[in-house]
């Protein structure tokens, strides 16, 4: 019984020490980075050149990165970020930075699809639909062309067809 009381007291004391340490050494996140991150589409597609939306938001705020690199966000996102950061964006900069737009069409080869649902579970925008053990399909209007589904398909039945055209 005394052992139980001693361990309970030590656990309580250790909990207080840990909570104090966590409070004292907490990291200070820039609130503007959080606001810009909330504006981004959170598709984690890496088309901007960063590994995800949070690193891109951090680069926009801290390193003055261009705000027109997010292809899924489009011109509405550029306007929203410019209003949050109180910067003027000339009309010519409202165009996404890539000279050639890539229109990716994602196709699932139904003869090779085993219905494992790995592609659907990793799709950041839920553009792949289908039930487990059944053939899946891609909703093209929601697909951002991030290629994450390609990495997780065990049968390599997903194909990306890239169409490139001048703006």
From Swiss-Prot:
Q: Where does [4Fe-4S] cluster 1 bind?
A: 45, 48, 53, 70
What keywords does the record list, in alphabetical order? Answer: 4Fe-4S, Cell inner membrane, Cell membrane, Electron transport, Iron, Iron-sulfur, Membrane, Metal-binding, Repeat, Translocase, Transport
Which InterPro entries does the entry link to?
4Fe-4S_dom, 4Fe4S_Fe-S-bd, 4Fe4S_Fe_S_CS, Elect_transpt_cplx_RnfB/RsxB, RnfB/RsxB_Proteobac, RnfB_subfamily
Q: Where does [4Fe-4S] cluster 3 bind?
A: 123, 143, 146, 149
Cofactor note text: Binds 3 [4Fe-4S] clusters.
This protein is called Ion-translocating oxidoreductase complex subunit B
Compartments annotated for it: namely: Cell inner membrane
Q: Which residue intervals make up region (Hydrophobic)?
A: 1-22
Can you tell me which residues bind [4Fe-4S] cluster 2? 113, 116, 119, 153
**SUPFAM superfamilies membership:** 4Fe-4S ferredoxins (SSF54862)
Look at the named UniProt entry and state the broad enzyme category this protein falls under.
translocase
Subunit structure, interactors included: The complex is composed of six subunits: RnfA, RnfB, RnfC, RnfD, RnfE and RnfG.
Specify the signal sequence span: none
Q: Which GO terms describe its cellular component?
A: plasma membrane
Residue intervals of the 4Fe-4S domain: 28-87
Q: Coiled-coil segments, which residues?
A: none
UniProt cofactor(s): [4Fe-4S] cluster
One GO process term, biological-process aspect: electron transport chain
Gene giving rise to this polypeptide: rnfB
Give the PANTHER family listed for this entry: ION-TRANSLOCATING OXIDOREDUCTASE COMPLEX SUBUNIT B, OXIDOREDUCTASE
Recorded family membership: Belongs to the 4Fe4S bacterial-type ferredoxin family. RnfB subfamily.
Stated role: Part of a membrane-bound complex that couples electron transfer with translocation of ions across the membrane.
Query: What EC number(s) has UniProt assigned to this enzyme?
Result: 7.-.-.-
Q: Name one GO molecular function term.
A: metal ion binding
| Domain 4Fe-4S ferredoxin-type stretches | 104-133, 134-163
